[in-house]
């Protein structure tokens, strides 16, 4: 703790800052030691203070961090929640929730005063909806630990649903999503050890020892997401379009995002124990996404309408139409990685790459 600091700054903050700032650390591996740090003091007061410190560290990296730090901080928070860790104080921290809400709805700028990157906005919104689904699926709506996250998810989902209905009534494109045109998530694995030549020529490299836990988790999430989407479609009333059902649509968005991660690992994993499982996971996701498309509303609009831009008040990318993204941590290397903006505001368009 600094001499003039009003807030504690212990190993908890140092650990969070370290593991979200570099891809050299596998979050799934670092999670357990971090949980132990937060739970180290069994005294109720210290336990509360530790959670407050963790929430503050997460918020700082979301607010002031570069894109890598923001992305990995969201991933770390998702791991806490998805693994069933009940940190009541951390999950209900008002400032953290406000920052997440502002990011997910694109209503607040980063600490530098600039707009958040579209990919970060999409990621935060997708996580907020997935946390809401996790809470409802496990009947945790009345659990005090998740009350803040539940309200956050509802807010994001309502904003998305409102913009989606507005597009349908205002002539936005409907019909099939063309999800098979989705590209792999090229932000999922970009090792800091890659040379400029590696980045320029897109040479696939992966450290299986570090990535194995993450691959297992993604395979598990992919299969669970496919089943969840299929189940939501089975429960649709006869004659109701999948695109008109909020639950089915949110599960479709999740499944599509996870499939992009699976596709990325299929580019990197060419042999070994995970290859067959990744192929199977992709097949299951494709089947579920296709089933959603088969139940979607069709219209007579031309294919070109899928390429239109939308102003939905949530994902305003007009100011973010960059042809490439330069990471503030390593601008020379990151400038070699192209950035292609997408239109999350139209979850059924060709350019939607969650």
From Swiss-Prot:
Residues 15-161 form the VHS domain. It comes from the Eukaryota. It is found in: Cytoplasm, Cell cortex; Cytoplasm, Cytoskeleton. The keyword Cytoplasm applies. GO terms for biological process: actin cortical patch localization; actin cytoskeleton organization; actin filament organization; endocytosis. Keywords: Cytoplasm, Cytoskeleton, Endocytosis. Interacts with SLA1 and LAS17. This is LAS seventeen-binding protein 5. It comes from Saccharomyces cerevisiae (strain ATCC 204508 / S288c) (Baker's yeast).
């Amino acid at each position: 703790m600094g001499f003039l600091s009003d807030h504690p700054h212990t190993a908890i903050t140092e650990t969070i800052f370290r593991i979200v700032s570099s891809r050299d650390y596998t979050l799934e591996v670092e999670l357990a030691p971090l949980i132990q740090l937060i739970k180290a003091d069994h005294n109720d007061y210290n336990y509360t203070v530790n959670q407050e410190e963790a929430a503050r560290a997460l918020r700082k990296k979301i607010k002031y961090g570069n894109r890598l730090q923001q992305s990995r901080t969201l991933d770390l928070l998702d791991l806490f929640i998805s693994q069933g860790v009940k940190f009541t104080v951390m999950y209900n921290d008002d400032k953290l929730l406000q920052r997440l809400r502002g990011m997910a709805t694109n209503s607040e700028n980063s600490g530098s005063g600039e707009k958040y990157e579209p990919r970060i906005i999409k990621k935060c919104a997708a996580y907020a909806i997935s946390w809401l689904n996790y809470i409802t699926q496990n009947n945790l709506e009345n659990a005090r630990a998740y009350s803040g996250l539940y309200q956050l998810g509802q807010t994001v989902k309502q904003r998305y649903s409102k913009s989606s209905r507005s597009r349908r009534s205002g002539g936005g494109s409907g019909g099939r999503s063309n999800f098979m045109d989705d590209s792999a998530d090229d932000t999922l694995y970009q090792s800091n050890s890659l040379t400029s030549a590696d980045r320029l020529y897109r040479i696939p490299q992966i450290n299986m020892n570090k990535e194995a836990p993450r691959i297992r988790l993604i395979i598990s999430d992919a299969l669970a997401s496919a089943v969840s989407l299929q189940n939501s479609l089975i429960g649709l009333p006869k004659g109701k379009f999948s695109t008109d059902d909020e639950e089915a649509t949110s599960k479709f968005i999740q499944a599509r995002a996870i499939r992009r991660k699976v596709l990325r690992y299929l580019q990197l994993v060419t042999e070994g124990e995970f290859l067959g499982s990744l192929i199977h996971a992709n097949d299951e996701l494709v089947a579920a996404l296709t089933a959603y498309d088969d139940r979607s509303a069709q219209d007579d609009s031309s294919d070109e309408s899928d390429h239109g831009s939308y102003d939905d008040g949530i994902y305003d990318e007009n100011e973010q139409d960059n042809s490439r993204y330069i990471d503030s941590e390593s601008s020379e290397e990151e400038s070699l990685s192209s950035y292609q903006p997408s239109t999350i505001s139209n979850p059924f368009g060709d350019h939607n790459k969650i």
